[in-house]
Amino acid sequence: MVRSDNDTWDLASSVGATATMVAAGRAVVSQDPGGLINDPFAAPLVRAVGIEALTMLADGKFDIEKVLPESAARVRANIDEMAVRTKFFDDYFMDATGRGVGQAVILASGLDSRAYRLPWPDGTVVYEIDQPDVIEFKTRTLADLGAEPTCERRTVSIDLRDDWPAALRAAGFDPSAPTAWCAEGLLIYLPPEAQDKLFDDIHHLSAPGSTVATEFVPALKDFDPEKARQATETLTRMGVDIDMPSLIYHGERHSASDYLETKGWQMDSAARATLFTRYGLPAPGHDDDDPLGEIIYISGTLR
């Protein structure tokens, strides 16, 4: 399905299904007691969505080497990346709130369960923004599991293409207080101008001392749809109906780090291989068939 300005989705289709796929990856890496992360809610959330192949993956019942012998190494590398990515943002939130930031905003929160699994400091308010059906599904599913937030969780049921800043304020957000912003796994699904607007909105809502973290994919300007189609074929063989080329907005766009620095944010960046090494995992080798190429993890503070 080709993206449009007003397209919608649930957690089993379009962009929503990618959130379920990411949660399945978190479920896999959480099976290792000594692993980088522990997300006990990932597998039950994936099961509740009901995509059979992803449920099998989340439950450790999908034989990657048997079903995808020629792609197994890449799939394993992608799962390792989910561990690294999740750890990066977990650490980001704990560092920011540990230094006294009292509110956090998770943009396009999907099946993110940090409001339920991270040890937030007392009094922390976590806002989750996503489409109404996504918010309702996750809230209901976690309630059925008996899960309780480890923070004051406030949901903001709105599409990021609508006036989410107004909805966030209406939910009690305080723009005069420092905020920890997170845009995990989001930018590739935004047109370039929407990415700029997102950061403009974040900046206008941020008090000094606020922090932001996201990933940036420099190669989107040279995006190769054919390589993305190959990735889609791998997903299809797994039994997952996600058409990656139709979901990603590519073309020239501002570097997220550079754009924020022009607004007074002090930014740091780390390449994918740097994070793998930091967290004790073997860095992935260069993959000529990777449709996204390098991924840069960035974070920064508004001075």
Swiss-Prot record:
Enzyme Commission number(s) from the entry: 2.1.1.-
An example Gene Ontology biological process: methylation
InterPro entries listed in its UniProt record: Ppm1/Ppm2/Tcmp, SAM-dependent_MTases_sf, SAM_mthyl_Trfase_ML2640-like
Protein's UniProt keywords contain Methyltransferase: yes
Top EC class for this record: transferase
Residues where S-adenosyl-L-methionine binds: D130, D159, L160
Molecular function per GO: methyltransferase activity
UniProt entry keywords in alphabetical sequence: Methyltransferase, S-adenosyl-L-methionine, Transferase
Presence of keyword Methyltransferase: yes
PANTHER family, A to Z: S-ADENOSYL-L-METHIONINE-DEPENDENT METHYLTRANSFERASE YKTD-RELATED, S-ADENOSYL-L-METHIONINE-DEPENDENT METHYLTRANSFERASES SUPERFAMILY PROTEIN
Record function comment: Exhibits S-adenosyl-L-methionine-dependent methyltransferase activity.
Protein family according to the UniProt entry: Belongs to the UPF0677 family.
Protein name: Putative S-adenosyl-L-methionine-dependent methyltransferase MSMEG_1479/MSMEI_1443
Organism: Mycolicibacterium smegmatis (strain ATCC 700084 / mc(2)155)
